[in-house]
Amino acid sequence: MPSPVATVETDSLQQPILGSRRPSNYFWAIAVSVGGTGLLLAGLSSYLQVNLLPFSEPTRLAFLPQGLVMGLYGIAAILLASYLWFVISLDVGGGYNAFDRKTQKATIFRWGFPGKNRRVEITYPLSDIQAVRVDIKEGLNPKRALYLKVKGRGDVPLTRVGQPLPLTELESQGAELARFLAVPLEGL
């Protein structure tokens, strides 16, 4: 997701961060829901000897062991799908990075799981930001991320977790942020 463009006239920059509401999560939640429902109905059909699936004949399955195992796998899949839908509905990991010249603050905000730390919000003074660092590691498990180098705090991650950003988008976001904050861009 490209970040909004900051110009010299603007005093703030906000970058939205995609959390668990990614298309891949929707795909897996739907696939696991459909598969789990099918397995559970097949297991129930073999136990009740009533055809609950219109496109097959699960009543021909022996309940022990096939029907029982299919039912248990169906229950496990429905529990996993429930978790996926729960995480999607909460948008865990979603949020924004906001940088404001008027208030001289950088705010990193993310949604978490319910509880004491549902809202994760970290605020730094802009004067403590030393640089924007780009971290690129290629290979079997590539990593492409942006970090803020904050005085006395170490590196603070700015990019989403999961699918790595394309190099061009990562470079443009890093350059735009470094230009906006008037700090060096490291790692390229």
UniProtKB/Swiss-Prot annotation:
The chain crosses the membrane at residues 26-46, 68-88. GO terms for biological process: photosynthesis. Pfam families: Ycf4 (PF02392). One of its GO terms (cellular component) is photosystem I. It is a multi-pass membrane protein. It is found in: Cellular thylakoid membrane. It comes from the Bacteria. Keywords: Membrane, Photosynthesis, Thylakoid, Transmembrane, Transmembrane helix. Seems to be required for the assembly of the photosystem I complex. PANTHER family: PHOTOSYSTEM I ASSEMBLY PROTEIN YCF4, PTHR33288. This is Photosystem I assembly protein Ycf4. The gene is ycf4.
